[in-house]
């Protein structure tokens, strides 16, 4: 057994000993009272509200006012006369007043452990140091904690354990709680932003018979009653566009997508996506709307449009750079010429040399995108709209009027990561059918991320879809930016993990 394994074994033995002691205490509670886990205590205040409401009250003013309160929370520190509680908003001390609390209550308090949840009544007071606290007149145990909290000096520092036991992580790490409060604020602000502009929030199927709307490998399942294969959706796009056909001219959805792909600091198989569509608009309108949304989000969450991330600062207040795929390759790789990019064999050689997985059947447009992904994407630090993607890799986007080999599409990159994907939607049913057929050929040639042929979607387009622009924004990656989080797992409450050995 290695030294590390020995240390782990000793820690586990110590934890088991503490758990056994706590279970003995719970047994004593069960014996002493009929209900060990009561649910009749009702607090009337949160700690943060008390701190804010009475911030300007002096010790003497609080003493004269004798303001009664009922509070509840988890014991995080026990300093003998003072117990530090934590609720969902803040921490606050409660005072164990030996003059007012009954002897039996004082005896019970001595048996309580860190992690236990209590409910207390008392009056507000302020210490000589200026700290607000509750001078308790009564207190009781509401929930006995059977497992010890992480060591107060080291906390829960093992990253993998933080992800596996998010409930403990949230208990002991304020930074984690802040991250997920910000995530909630971001989603709420997006909803408000779009609703104020006339967008209707909708819900579309998670289980689909044909996985469409993105180039990705789906999760497959089986519907027993219908005896048919079904797929967890990789995107809601084709259903949202059906709604535009039906007459809902501005729609959006914030929900989960599922892609049977690798796990990394940027990817989780289950992730949250915003998709929105607006009729009588194009991809340039969406660029303007996206800039406005991102500026408002940064201002609302951070109080500034300068977004710190690691050792960098992203400037959301400045106009986002707009650059085509083709031009971006030339800008960031001066050794590559336009002639190189327009020659299939030369482009294939460049893509291979850059490390792209070239199969040999790719067209020029696909090769250009491969080169972009390998040689440019990671260099796009400040916000960049990369536009005019080749039509081969944009099977749902409208061709550009001036150059039909590319589409009216953009992807937004910040910090070298794709944050959004948008385009003027293809509403020509015949063109869409042809592109689906090209995707089927790609799939037959070995590309398991190529799209299926969706006959019902073609049927919908044949009824006529107005000129439309659509966009998808990855909520998880956006929250990563706004919370300065290095990994997507930091912003997903329960990320997917390999089973523990």
UniProtKB/Swiss-Prot annotation:
Binds 3 Mg(2+) ions per subunit. It is an enzyme of class 6 (ligase). It is found in: Cytoplasm. Transmembrane segments: none annotated. Mg(2+) 2 binds at residue 418. Mg(2+) 1 binds at residues 411, 418. Keywords: Aminoacyl-tRNA synthetase, ATP-binding, Cytoplasm, Ligase, Magnesium, Metal-binding, Nucleotide-binding, Protein biosynthesis. SUPFAM superfamilies: Class II aaRS and biotin synthetases (SSF55681), Nucleic acid-binding proteins (SSF50249). Its cofactor is Mg(2+). Gene3D superfamilies: Bira Bifunctional Protein, Domain 2, Nucleic acid-binding proteins. InterPro entries: Aa-tRNA-synt_II, aa-tRNA-synth_II, aa-tRNA-synth_II/BPL/LPL, Lys-tRNA-ligase_II, Lys-tRNA-ligase_II_N, Lys-tRNA-synth_II_C, NA-bd_OB-fold, NA-bd_OB_tRNA. Its EC number is 6.1.1.6. GO terms for biological process: lysyl-tRNA aminoacylation. Homodimer. This is Lysine--tRNA ligase. It comes from Pseudomonas aeruginosa (strain LESB58). The lineage of its organism: Bacteria, Pseudomonadati, Pseudomonadota, Gammaproteobacteria, Pseudomonadales. The gene is lysS.
